[in-house]
Amino acid sequence: MMSYAEKPEDITRDEWMEKLNNVHIQRADMNRLIMNYLVTEGFKEAAEKFRMESGIEPSVDLDSLDERIKIREMVLKGQIQEAIALINSLHPELLDTNRYLYFHLQQQHLIELIRLRETEAALEFAQTQLAEQGEESRECLTEMERTLALLAFDNPEESPFGDLLNMMQRQKVWSEVNQAVLDYENRESTPKLAKLLKLLLWAQNELDQKKVKYPKMTDLSKGTIEDPK
């Protein structure tokens, strides 16, 4: 028997993969994780198709996703004012109680004005709608200044702040809106699959902190596992 003072033997990648292959996961459990992800992220059409293929019933009425889907489409198209109006119609108090979310939506509208090269409208909007929040929050002020800095460049997409004009920026705002709406409705706002991935990263970090050598998953999207280092 190994004492606590002894160092455990290093495990190779092949040995690790063999152990993983011996772990059995029920297909139904995997399907429930997939359905949970689709519902939480608002992918109604995919959830309906997956229900037919897997026989797994969603935890909510899929028709309840319709309003969130409309909001997502608006945000991802850059129609921020329309999205704000729909959010206010759906949950009138949400943006009043979540001022940081409201700021991010307003900031995104400013970004869309800059994208369209509507400089005067962008400056006026920043002064009338965002300046007060910038005075109240240093973090908001920093983000507003970073956004307005786009105006200093002939090609803002190629500037040091060009990431604000990427599609990922709209996606980031939508994710924040989606989580806020689900939280407001007292519904699960983070997919169980995301929680499991976070648990995996936490466990690997704990092993790293203890200087344990083990086959590490280095790419979550591909499931890439590298040899111990």
From Swiss-Prot:
Keywords: Cytoplasm, Developmental protein, Nucleus, Wnt signaling pathway. It is found in: Cytoplasm; Nucleus. Disruption phenotype: Morpholino knockdown produces morphants which exhibit loss or reduction of dorsal embryonic structures and Wnt signaling deficiency. PROSITE patterns: CTLH, LISH. One of its GO terms (biological process) is determination of dorsal identity. Residues 64-121 form the CTLH domain. It comes from the Eukaryota. Residues 26-58 form the LisH domain. Pfam families: CTLH (PF10607), LisH (PF08513). Its main location: cytoplasm. One of its GO terms (cellular component) is cytoplasm. InterPro entries: CRA_dom (IPR013144), CTLH/CRA (IPR024964), CTLH_C (IPR006595), LisH (IPR006594), Ubq-SigPath_Reg (IPR050618). Identified in the CTLH complex that contains at least MAEA, RMND5A (or alternatively its paralog RMND5B), GID8, WDR26, and RANBP9 and/or RANBP10. Interacts with CTNNB1. Core component of the CTLH E3 ubiquitin-protein ligase complex that selectively accepts ubiquitin from UBE2H and mediates ubiquitination and subsequent proteasomal degradation of target proteins. Acts as a positive regulator of Wnt signaling pathway by promoting beta-catenin (CTNNB1) nuclear accumulation. Required for normal Wnt signaling and normal dorsoventral patterning during embryogenesis. This is Glucose-induced degradation protein 8-B homolog. It comes from Danio rerio (Zebrafish).
